Amino acid sequence: MHNPQHYMTGFGNEFATEAVAGSLPVGQNSPQRVAHGLYAEQLSGTAFTAPRGENRRSWLYRIRPAAVHGRFSLIEQSRLHNDFGGGPVPPDQMRWSPLPLPATPTDFVDGLYTMAGNGSPEAMTGVAVHLYAANASMHGRFFYNADGELLLVPQLGRLRVCTELGVLELEPQQIGVIPRGVRFRVELLDSAARGYVCENFGGLLRLPDLGPIGANGLANPRDFETPRAAFEQRDGAFELVAKFQGHLWRADIDHSPLDVVAWHGNYAPYRYDLRRFNTIGSISFDHPDPSIFTVLTSPSDTHGTANMDFAIFPPRWLVAQHTFRPPWFHRNVASEFMGLVHGVYDAKAEGFAPGGASLHNCMSGHGPDAATFDKASQADLTRPDVIAETMAFMFETRAVLRPTQQALSAAHRQADYQQCWSGLRAAFQHPPAKNTTSVLR
């Protein structure tokens, strides 16, 4: 699966790659005649005038420009959209079992299923959270998203994502990011695939600042991989599908748009193996805030507050003394959508299965279930807790995640989720009255 020669390493680097020698111009971007009869095309991911450290763009040298295709027409469908509803959002904690695998041939695009979201692509803020379940590769069709960049989190099955700028191979416990506007095709390397997608309408994903952690730790830049140039030259009757302003559109295209022979720049797909995350934790007491598990962050216009954080809860050792070691009970001004790629999440002993999901919106109380609380409260703290064979994650957003109607009414929603806390009984033992200073009456 890991083929280093197909990838270039580093996060946000200025890359240059060509599949045919001599295709990249030297010393300029747009020569009068590009080598080999190619076309020069710039793909901009930020404003031209964005600060240099945040500016993202790539120059593509391709067989045909991206403008060559037929007229778009609307695709009537109801599973993938930005309709997060104008009605009341229930403050309930919510949990879903895994999205069922399809019974009929379904590719990646047709298998996308919108769960929740906030903001909008036209405002360039917020996110949408989707699931996907597929059992077929994309044949004769290509997809791009004009609304946001896509963070793919496979849970079941390997994917081969063929993009304009090269090929990403993904397996569970890896993630892939497809920039806004990049065209791609998803091929299944196994009989079925399922996973999660965060569609980021806001600021481009980046590595979080490390502060006092120092120069190293969490997700290290060298572990991110960007594909080398790869192209195909195919003519035929194909379909180009676009997500634009919350709707799917289709156009006829008489060639494969994956025809970029060479490119240079810093706006490109990339992948990261979550097993390489350098986990930080307490070696004295207490459980630190979960921000220490942040892999990538999308900034907002409020300093210190993210549009979206992507955090993981990977294998780790818990050694804190005099401490309740699992994640504590919590009410959060942010909203948390969680998924499980592999194993068991250490705050939920039962009910949260790989492929499942939970949503704890702003100020909705959540935390370990009764079984986990009882076990951790009696644990022998002279021994470390080795949390192994797990990979949970969270999309955390500053704005409330509004669940879609299909998510609220889904057959795989767990109607009894709140019961996981029903066993948490009052154990308070009232001290003598002389030790009580104030009691509400």
UniProtKB/Swiss-Prot annotation:
<feature type="binding site">
    <location>
        <position position="366"/>
    </location>
    <ligand>
        <name>homogentisate</name>
    </ligand>
</feature>
<keyword id="KW-0585">Phenylalanine catabolism</keyword>
<feature type="active site" description="Proton acceptor">
    <location>
        <position position="287"/>
    </location>
</feature>
<comment type="subunit">
    <text>Hexamer; dimer of trimers.</text>
</comment>
<keyword id="KW-0828">Tyrosine catabolism</keyword>
<comment type="similarity">
    <text>Belongs to the homogentisate dioxygenase family.</text>
</comment>
<keyword id="KW-0223">Dioxygenase</keyword>
<dbReference type="Pfam" id="PF20510">
    <property type="entry name" value="HgmA_N"/>
</dbReference>
<dbReference type="InterPro" id="IPR046451">
    <property type="entry name" value="HgmA_C"/>
</dbReference>
<dbReference type="GO" id="GO:0004411">
    <property type="term" value="F:homogentisate 1,2-dioxygenase activity"/>
</dbReference>
<dbReference type="InterPro" id="IPR022950">
    <property type="entry name" value="Homogentis_dOase_bac"/>
</dbReference>
<feature type="binding site">
    <location>
        <position position="336"/>
    </location>
    <ligand>
        <name>Fe cation</name>
    </ligand>
</feature>
<feature type="binding site">
    <location>
        <position position="366"/>
    </location>
    <ligand>
        <name>Fe cation</name>
    </ligand>
</feature>
<comment type="function">
    <text>Involved in the catabolism of homogentisate (2,5-dihydroxyphenylacetate or 2,5-OH-PhAc), a central intermediate in the degradation of phenylalanine and tyrosine. Catalyzes the oxidative ring cleavage of the aromatic ring of homogentisate to yield maleylacetoacetate.</text>
</comment>
<keyword id="KW-0408">Iron</keyword>
<protein>
    <recommendedName>
        <fullName>Homogentisate 1,2-dioxygenase</fullName>
        <ecNumber>1.13.11.5</ecNumber>
    </recommendedName>
</protein>
<dbReference type="InterPro" id="IPR014710">
    <property type="entry name" value="RmlC-like_jellyroll"/>
</dbReference>
<comment type="pathway">
    <text>Amino-acid degradation; L-phenylalanine degradation; acetoacetate and fumarate from L-phenylalanine: step 4/6.</text>
</comment>
<dbReference type="GO" id="GO:0006559">
    <property type="term" value="P:L-phenylalanine catabolic process"/>
</dbReference>
<dbReference type="InterPro" id="IPR046452">
    <property type="entry name" value="HgmA_N"/>
</dbReference>
<dbReference type="Pfam" id="PF04209">
    <property type="entry name" value="HgmA_C"/>
</dbReference>
<feature type="binding site">
    <location>
        <position position="330"/>
    </location>
    <ligand>
        <name>Fe cation</name>
    </ligand>
</feature>
<keyword id="KW-0560">Oxidoreductase</keyword>
<dbReference type="GO" id="GO:0005737">
    <property type="term" value="C:cytoplasm"/>
</dbReference>
<dbReference type="GO" id="GO:0006572">
    <property type="term" value="P:tyrosine catabolic process"/>
</dbReference>
<feature type="binding site">
    <location>
        <position position="345"/>
    </location>
    <ligand>
        <name>homogentisate</name>
    </ligand>
</feature>
<dbReference type="InterPro" id="IPR005708">
    <property type="entry name" value="Homogentis_dOase"/>
</dbReference>
<keyword id="KW-0479">Metal-binding</keyword>
<dbReference type="GO" id="GO:0005506">
    <property type="term" value="F:iron ion binding"/>
</dbReference>
<dbReference type="InterPro" id="IPR011051">
    <property type="entry name" value="RmlC_Cupin_sf"/>
</dbReference>
